[in-house]
Amino acid sequence: MARCADRNDDMTLHRYVPPFSLPPHGDALAADSWHVIAGRGAATLQLPAHWPSLWLPMRGRLSMQAQDAHWTLFGGEGQLWRAGALNVQASHESRWLALVAAPTVWNVAFANSADDEEPLPWRGDPGDGVHEAMEALAHDDDALALLIPALIDRQRDVAACLPRCRGRTLAHRRQALLRLLNLRHLMQCHVEADDDASIDVPWLASRAHYSPGHLIRLHRAVFGETPSDYFTRLRQARAWELVRETDMPVATITHRLGFESQSAFCRAFKHAFGMTATQARREADACAA
């Protein structure tokens, strides 16, 4: 393991560069420090439960696995994760950056940058600010002062949901939001994996330790839709992607997305998009030509 430690007035920052071998489950990582990983090529990492982490694959892909979910991050995407233990496997052609620390390290950094701020989970386009700051942090401690404000800006849309959460204190409302965001992530992973196994409100509610009725009410109050509404939107978007961007038979798409029958899928597709799957595929082929 190649590692260097750098100090400034506020924190210790450890850098890990290939070849490296992080301790299993991260149990030997210093809990009062930042850990920056500049990865290249195949690698497998196991991170401690409850440690937030930021992931940016620059090239290739990262296969992520947590309780009840597995998903893939591709080059150009990013994710801030804080929902339990995480296993990460990097592809052999990958180049990626990660920032890992104990919750107290993250919380102090966010609170010092903006009152009442705390890292919130997100997945998708990291934005130029986060991307550039992480690239710089791989070799420059001072880039952390740029990264934290960029992360706060990146999570602004997520943080806007916080006042709509129920709870007597800010900590209670934040905990409710984290639970809901994790459930939405589980639904997204389920649809992306084309998993035809059953996923329903009672199953989701059990993961968040809510009753089904309470979950429905809270999710609607925070996001303006029920969990079922959100799952339907995700499945519709996935159906559109598979129909338009692959040559997968409709019968196979039906099975992968968990529809009861091909006719049920075709009815749902036409209701959602105003055209049949065949018409959508022909339109895509015409555009490609």
Per-region residue spans from a language model:
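Short, Lys/Arg-enriched N-terminal segments with co-localized hydrophobic residues
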Residues: 4-10
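Helix-turn-helix/winged-helix DNA-binding modules
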Residues: 54, 175, 192, 196-197, ...
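Proline-centered helix-kink/hinge sites
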Residues: 227, 276-277
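Short hydrophobic/aromatic patch on the recognition helix
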Residues: 215, 219, 264-265, 269
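Short, Lys/Arg-enriched, Trp-marked, Pro/Gly-tolerant hinge/linker segments that flank
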Residues: 115-128, 135-208, 221-233
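Core residues of bacterial helix-turn-helix
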Residues: 207-209, 257-258, 269
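N-terminal regulatory/effector-sensing and dimerization cores
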Residues: 11-117
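Terminal helix-turn-helix DNA-binding modules in bacterial transcription factors
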Residues: 181, 185-189, 198-202, 220-262, ...
